[in-house]
Amino acid sequence: MKNTGTLKVTLPTEREIVMTRVFDAPRRLVFDALTKPELFKRWFGPRGWSLVVCEIDLKVGGAWRSVLRGPGGKEMGMRGVYQEIVPPERLVSTEKFDDYPGESLNTLVLVEQGGKTTLTITVLYESQGIRDAVIKSGMEHGAAECYDKLAEMLAPENK
């Protein structure tokens, strides 16, 4: 695959996308930014988009829902259910977009070393066709922008 800025995207199997990004922050702060609505709202979504719905019920079996609104009012909604939660190191949830077929299983792992945190998210799709359609959509650019915004929020001068 390719690197988009500091986001590394790989395709290790026919049905997976793996994204990796290093943040200059302890994993507890990264975990909080992923799971607390008041923080999640500050960084999630590509530049020019706003998060108009942010619901996080952080428990196994709990649901999450996000709706992004882009330029011109276009909305993109997604939702899922938490399958596993191990603070501050692991989150597993389903993910389904309102306007796209299929559901994925997202496994997010945070590893801290030397005050920096490596985020690795493995997205497992129902089929190679769905995975390939996601890649062709340019998803990695939107994800890279989101993680750039998260890095900015986590920067020591912004804490």
Language model feature labels by segment:
Residues 1-50:
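Hydrophobic ligand-binding cavity/cleft-lining segments
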Residues 8, 55, 81, 107-109:
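Short, surface-exposed charged micro-motifs
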Residues 14-20, 27, 51, 63, ...:
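Intrinsic-disorder/low-complexity, polar/charged segments enriched in Ser/Thr/Lys/Arg/Asp/Glu/Gln
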Residues 27-28, 58-59, 83-89, 109-118:
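A short, structured loop/turn motif at beta-sheet edges
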Residues 30, 40, 64, 82, ...:
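Hydrophobic pocket/interface hotspot
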Residues 51-94:
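Glycine-rich portal/gate segments that line the openings of hydrophobic small-molecule binding cavities
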Residues 92-145:
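Beta-strand/loop substructures that line and gate deep hydrophobic ligand-binding cavities in soluble
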Residues 155-159:
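Short, highly charged C-terminal tails/helix-capping segments
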